[in-house]
């Protein structure tokens, strides 16, 4: 399933890239083609293809991710994408 995640947070793009790079390594068995587009400081779009939703959700709801989200007041809006 192709997804798009719009993340709004208090912090810098570098802050986001640190957690993204941590997650991307963990997600290597459950998602492919993960890419980030920067809208502005504090807002990014992440797109990718989730191949194992259960494993993906496990990583995205991990304690490390929850702590980062709380620290940076991160709100994620997730969309599924379908090629037309």
Give the location of each predicted region.
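Short S/T/G/P-rich N-terminal loop/turn motif that feeds into the first structured element of a domain
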Residues: 1-68, 72-84
